Amino acid sequence: MSGRGGRRRGPGQDSGSGQPSPSLSRGGGSRRGRGRVPSGPPPYSSYTPPRPQVAPTQPPPPSAPSTSTAPAYHPLSSSGAESLMREVSQKLTLEPESATTAPLLPPSSSKAIRSAQRPGVGRDGEKCKVRANHFLVKFADKDLHHYDVSITPEVTSKKTNRIIMQQLTDLYKQSHLGGRCPAYDGRKGLYAAGALPFESKEFFVKIIDEDQGRGSSSSATKEWQYKVAVKLVSKPDLHYLREFLLRRHFEAPQETIQVLDVVLRAKPSENYTVVGRSFFHPDLGPKGELGNGIDYWMGYYQSLRPTQMGLSLNIDVSARSFYEPLLVTDFVTKHFKRTSLKRPLSDQDCVKLTTALKGVKVRLIHMAYAKTCKIVGISRLPISELTFTLDDKKTNVSVVQYFLEKYEIVLKHPSLPALQSGSEAKPIYLPMELCQIVEGQRYTKKLNDQQVRALLKATCKRPPDRERDIRRMVSNNNFNGEERVSEFGIHVGQELALVEARVLPAPVLKYHDTGPEKSVKPSKGAWNMINKKMVNGGEVDNWTCVNFSSNYANISNDFCTRLVEMCNNKGMVFRHTAAVPIRSAHPFRIDQTLRDVYEESTRQKRPLKLLIIILPDQSGSYGKIKRICETELGIVSQCCQPKQASKYYPQYFENLALKINVKVGGRNTVLNDAIEKTIPLVSDDPTIIFGADVTHPQPGEDSSPSIAAVVASIDWPEVTKYRGIVSAQPHREEIIQDLYKTVQDPQKGVVPSGMIRELLISFYKSTRRKPLRIIFYRDGVSEGQFSQVLLYEMDAIRKACASIQDNYMPPVTFVVVQKRHRTRLFPTDTASTDKSGNIVAGTVVDTIICHPTEFDFYLNSHAGIMGTSKPTHYHVLYDENKFTADNFQVLTNNLCYTYARCTRSVSIVPPAYYAHLVAFRARYYIEDETSDSGSANARRNARDRNVEAQPLPSIRENVKEVMFYC
């Protein structure tokens, strides 16, 4: 478990205990609204932010050019920026488009797009040394050759492909391969450190089929013959790679890097279970049980990357869930926590078991030879009622009778269904008690809460322990002793990279002038609210509380009294008496109770500004409550865990007050530099900061849409309030589809629309200023998607701006935010260590392990709590604002102290974090339609993935006006 900036209950939830967590996990999507300075009493602070004025629905084009000192938009002179702008200008269309938006297609070529070049390295902050889990890779000048491999009949399994190619190498290494030992990638690529004695050749290889004919009753060993065609394709250039690493070229030779990567992965791929870029095996570390028939295995992640120090091998320890190699009957016992299998499985259990076991390989233990089968389902009837026709096509026999007569086996569990192999047309029925799950199969389904806790407990390692395990993995792998690695002239260093880092200072945070402490400078990523008042307290006039807890049914009045008192003490204006009576209700009546409260407040003409909810004792109701409140009734809600609510801890009430304040339009704190307008570039001109994320369904949810979320700051110069928008899009589509679009209006015809346009207009309504700079933090993008995402989404941003006003093209800085990387930073001395043993908050690295030429950096902006902290990787893909390294690194670090839900700096810049929270919230709005309940929707297969996503339920307007997702 990585070090986190605070405990969390689950992404997007606003209930829980202790300090709300600033750490980030992934999931879902939703919408977000404009915050407002509350009406009523004057602000508590001598600093008063600009109040929104009455504005037209759309901002009118100004009659004269802006008097701002911001330079007019000009493309950068670098060839990278020019090439992108050529692509964008070709796609930019100012005339209205067809109302039917065509699906985005991949560009014909994105090679012309080049990421922003590094504008020098940062110098701000106190220097220190850290170690990184990167190992220097040296390589000799070799004559690399890339060959294409074609195997007939076609094989889809990489494991089988590797067995075939290993057999080919063993048979023909000396006679036909010139004594060379080529490296194979498991698919189409074969690489040699020198020419093979041919340009094109066919080989024939025989291997034993581990499935023994897939259903044949013959005990004879069965062999399969494959034809392998090998043909020369190219000669990757190591010289060009050296030139790139020396920064004499800007385009990374990916093919050459891939060759060396395949060589380093060849031996582990043959010996271990491969999952993406990671390897797992029981010998790589301790394994343990997660429960329900699932184990965890330890392993390691490995990736070869170009860095400033040269090629770097990134190694990190990892853990994954695997099926226990059990008899299927034992798996059923563990999975359903049964003590006996005498009772038949229910229909619901059968659906769950099918989901858990579909695609799993089992070994038949009653056979005299090793035979494996793949499970395609389970029978509808118990095995005692199943019959089939023998091979003579005349005799019909029961499965129970067949096993008794054929194998002299009396089945012990005839009431259980049979496992089904083969096909629907010709099923093969297998008794569960005679099938053992084959070892080494990854469990890809969603882990339950108990399993997640067990996995985190087993894998959460303090920095010294994680560093030790990484060193052990590298030593045990003995890369330099492997035949192919030596043949290719590759040498892997044994020491972690020593990197020069800097610790950026924490920003000064402004609080209310009426509090004893008017500002604070956080220490080691944390501070508290003692003697401080919120810089802008929100107003809550109409509120009430509903308690759905049975175990804590009598706490409602005392709890609300203490919560209201805390909110008022911290600077809010919170009415002491509820608008409608506080009540308790049964959790089975959530829907009706919420509607009753809404109708009662409406009848009394006291519409609720806040509904406090004490959740049921059993989990599972949170999403339902949020969906009803936000999409049906139009009520902002604050949910509380009953166990925590009953303890009356002041810290818990303080945390709730922080969340409630921003939900009703207030601000908790702002950067002092923002008030004094001393943030470089951002304070100079009206600047809007976006955060964007796309979250995808859990594995196995083939019919669920992906959800895109975009948030944007709507206050300037404070940059603390973020309005959010969400949109459903096709399953696992990464590019955000609705950043810009056109729609058909009944009166106006085709009109421009989309997320960016709506948020730009919201900024104008709130500040009466056009944004003259755009900063776009984009989360959730892998390196392979950089070019496409930049091309499409920059194009959408440009079109959205142009749709508001001709020639309106504010300069854009487009930044990818990555948490799903495997770089870890370890302190080298106690002076640069926090109490968790991690590097301190504010540690930034932009040398040695970063890209040779592009503008990227690692920032550890949060204080670790447990485990090893994971820095966030920021990669600036496009920068028309011309930030210096220091300016952008300091801005990003300082923003991490403005997260509204806690008094800790967070691990990821808040706009991206908020986008994640908004997206996760929207997942609750549709979970009833896409839940894994055995419904037709849940069983829909991959052929439905590209259908148009259904629109999300609309969030009520009054809810969208505030940061309801906090």
Question: Can you annotate each of these PLM segments?
Answer:
Residues 2-966:
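Long, low-complexity, intrinsically disordered terminal regions
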